[in-house]
């Protein structure tokens, strides 16, 4: 939906608000939120900033099309019914044709261990669903873009080895990666696989980071129900597809997650992806000359995360390696 159309229609946008336990309340978005501004958009739909009328808090509204809708179920304790006035309760209806999205289910489950991922509201307008979540700050991709020109020039002229600014940027990158690892591992341990981990889906607000966009996320079965993940289960960004998806037609979610860390480390170091052609990752043509100018432990970690053999990636030692690398960057002046 074009931005101008959505902004103009917001005040009168008729939706159904999910109250819980299969109940819906016909209403307008403007009954609960003030529209503020457009934030971002993609193939899924669009992101907008709105203000909660009840609290005055700025929150994020994600408007997603039902092109690839996966239904979910919210637990019984997730309910808005108790906060309704008597006259609103009379308008609540049961609609078995409406379902909440799997993304909403994942957010509610994730918020039990990561409160910043709380789902505040859920709406359905027939053609799309709308999620209301906390505002988590700037995306890591946006932060990186603010340094892109300087880093690109340092890389282009091979002037980044030993550069003070670049060393501090690498240290910041590793700090981000450690925080991202903790969040992703917590989610993975409760059975949630993000499936699209990248800087665009990491928000930074001071010292805090939030993982966002669970539109293609999936549930990880326990070891007793372990399934084979086929290439069709990978629905993330093409620049983050691990080689085993193409060579064997299957992959392991954690192996792919570690691969994503390698791609992110490379991208944030050089402001470009390690593989530029759609199928180049199958040939694994890393540019060694660039990596050789990084601190050796940094370059080695990228190489291992981007190993063609999934079992040779630092599957169990990634956090330790990142922590050691962070300490190494703090103790060296130049390399």
Swiss-Prot record:
- What one GO molecular function would you report for this record? protein serine/threonine kinase activity
Q: Which domain of life is it from?
A: Viruses
Class of the enzyme per the UniProt entry, highest EC level: transferase
Residue ranges annotated for the Protein kinase domain, each copy included? 33-329
Which GO BP terms sit in this record? intracellular signal transduction
Q: Which residue positions are annotated as catalytic?
A: 196
What UniProt keywords apply to this chain's record, in alphabetical order? ATP-binding, Kinase, Nucleotide-binding, Serine/threonine-protein kinase, Transferase
InterPro entries per record: Kinase-like_dom_sf, Prot_kinase_dom, Ser/Thr_kinase_AS
Bilayer-spanning residue ranges = none
Annotated ATP binding sites: 39-47, 62
UniProt-listed Enzyme Commission number(s): 2.7.11.-
Write one Pfam family the protein is assigned to: Pkinase
Similarity annotation: Belongs to the protein kinase superfamily. Ser/Thr protein kinase family.
Identification of the protein by name: Putative serine/threonine-protein kinase 040L
